[in-house]
């Protein structure tokens, strides 16, 4: 048999090219180890391809929890991660008031950033933070996880593909299973900035257009303590979009049957809708009628897949040097809509978003 000559130098060069072109693993540090920080940590440790979690910090870090996850670096001060050359990206999951200052610090340190919503409640603060992001050239993704829900994403794809024709009406139903404590409400920024902000983002996502006008109606029908804290617990909000579509958002802080999350887009060629997720798809039919499971009760289980998918999308954007799917402007726009809704509720008339 005739032996083939192998050019070892050429083979080594080819292997080097393959390694050079292979996307690198993205090494993370997390700021904040509360409920959402721990959720993201567990996802990065085992459910997100191409990611590595090196560090997590929190002033009140549960060291026993961190040790159980074998996270190499832990601490109370997030600044220990900013000077670490191994850390490529920082996930900001701290209290909302700390998001913008930490975002600026991370951008100035040259770290890619995944920031939970909201960046801030003040548009000026958000714009200043985004200016630092633009200056640094890093990638930023804002944590509007519901865009990555498989059902909601499928509806959006129907709109984007033109299968529904021109969108005419977007309807979003978002009801919590139980109201938050009044002390939480007092520091939340209000229902529109705390709860409905997800729905304002979803309205933009589904319609493919910007919201131009808001008319908000609100009431205290669930818990009088929420009213005493200066907020509402029930709302209906009508929207106008730049592309001519109309929208309706229904909110309640308490749905006795569970976490009610539904969307519908009606267009010139048809309708697409996504119903609630339930623990099982079983349906019982008997002489009493039809019985099916209640919706999933808690947001962490309802949006379990969405939390993983949004982080995978961020990691893929960093690895492949592509734009993130939820930009800094996507973080700003829902805040402007929420503030317009607050103004509308206060004044009792429609409010232009551009006036904010």
Regions found by a protein language model. Give the residues of each.
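NAD(P)-dinucleotide binding in Rossmann-like oxidoreductases
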Residues: 27, 220, 225-228, 242-309, ...
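Hydrophobic residues in well-ordered beta-strands that form the structural core
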Residues: 75, 92, 115, 140-142, ...
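C-terminal helix-rich "cap/oligomerization" subdomain common to oxidoreductases
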Residues: 1-25, 89-92, 313-356
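N-terminal Rossmann-like dinucleotide-binding module
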Residues: 2-69
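Rossmann-like dinucleotide-binding domain that binds NAD(P)(H)
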Residues: 182-246, 252-257, 329
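A contiguous active-site-proximal alpha/beta segment in oxidoreductase catalytic domains
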Residues: 97, 120-181
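Beta-loop-alpha module in the N-terminal Rossmann-like domain of NAD(P)-dependent dehydrogenases
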Residues: 40, 72-132
């Amino acid at each position: 048999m005739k032996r083939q000559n192998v050019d070892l130098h050429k083979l080594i060069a080819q292997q080097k090219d393959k390694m050079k072109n292979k996307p690198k693993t993205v090494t993370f540090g997390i700021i904040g180890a509360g409920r959402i920080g721990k959720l993201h940590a567990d996802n990065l440790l085992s459910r997100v391809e191409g990611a590595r979690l090196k560090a997590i910090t929190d002033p009140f870090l549960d060291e026993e929890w961190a040790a159980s996850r074998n996270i190499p670096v832990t601490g109370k001060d997030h600044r220990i991660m900013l000077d670490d050359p191994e850390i490529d990206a920082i996930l900001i999951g701290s209290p909302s008031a700390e998001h913008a200052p930490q975002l600026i610090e991370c951008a100035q340190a040259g770290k890619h950033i995944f920031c939970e919503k909201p960046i801030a409640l003040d548009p000026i603060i958000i714009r200043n933070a985004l200016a630092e992001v633009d200056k640094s050239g890093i990638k930023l993704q804002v944590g509007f996880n519901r865009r990555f829900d498989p059902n909601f994403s499928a509806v959006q794809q129907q709109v984007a593909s033109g299968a529904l024709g021109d969108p005419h009406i977007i309807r979003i139903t978002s009801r919590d299973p139980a109201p938050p404590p009044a002390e939480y409400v007092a520091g939340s920024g209000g229902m529109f900035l705390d709860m409905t902000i997800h729905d304002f983002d979803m309205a933009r996502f589904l319609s493919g257009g910007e919201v131009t006008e808001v008319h908000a109606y609100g009431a205290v029908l669930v818990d009088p303590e929420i009213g005493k804290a200066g907020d509402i617990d029930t709302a209906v909000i009508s929207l106008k979009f730049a592309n001519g579509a109309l929208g309706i958002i229904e909110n309640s802080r308490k749905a006795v049957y569970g976490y009610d999350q539904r969307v519908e887009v009606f267009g010139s060629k048809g309708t697409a809708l996504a119903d609630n997720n339930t623990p099982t798809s079983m349906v019982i039919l008997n002489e009493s009628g039809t019985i099916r499971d209640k919706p999933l009760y808690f947001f962490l289980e309802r949006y379990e897949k969405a939390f993983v998918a949004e982080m995978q999308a961020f990691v893929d954007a960093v690895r492949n040097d592509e734009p993130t799917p939820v930009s800094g402007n996507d973080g700003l726009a829902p805040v402007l809509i929420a503030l317009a809704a607050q103004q509308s509720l206060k004044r009792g008339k429609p409010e232009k978003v551009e006036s904010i």
